[in-house]
Amino acid sequence: MTDKLYLDADRLLNDSFRLADQVYRSGFEPTFIMALWRGGAPIGLAVQEYFAYREIETDHILVRTSYYHGIDNQSREVQIYGLNYLVKNLQAEDRVLIVDDVYDTGRTIISIIESMQDRLKLNMPQQVRVAVP
């Protein structure tokens, strides 16, 4: 079993701003920020606020995923809720930043991107990046 690291609110906020700064300094300027509910929500908020401070306009949305059924039990398929707004508004030239609190197996992110590709077709943005602190 791995040890868990628990962050207080100040550390999470500071780490979130550092993450946003790394994305900004990489030259990537998202037009959409997708934060994953629940853990990614406060991080996504800080990232969006950072870009607003830099006068970079971004649209932002929370997307919920689920595949856990009780402690240590996972279903095979990731359920994704809240992509409809993105399907209606994204264009191929958009730049999407997916923000979450942890990157474990990559299953959730892969499922989201595959679902976006399936639903958006030719409107699927060519530039999709993932950011976690």
Model-found features: residue ranges?
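PRPP-associated nucleotide enzymes
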Residues: M1-P133
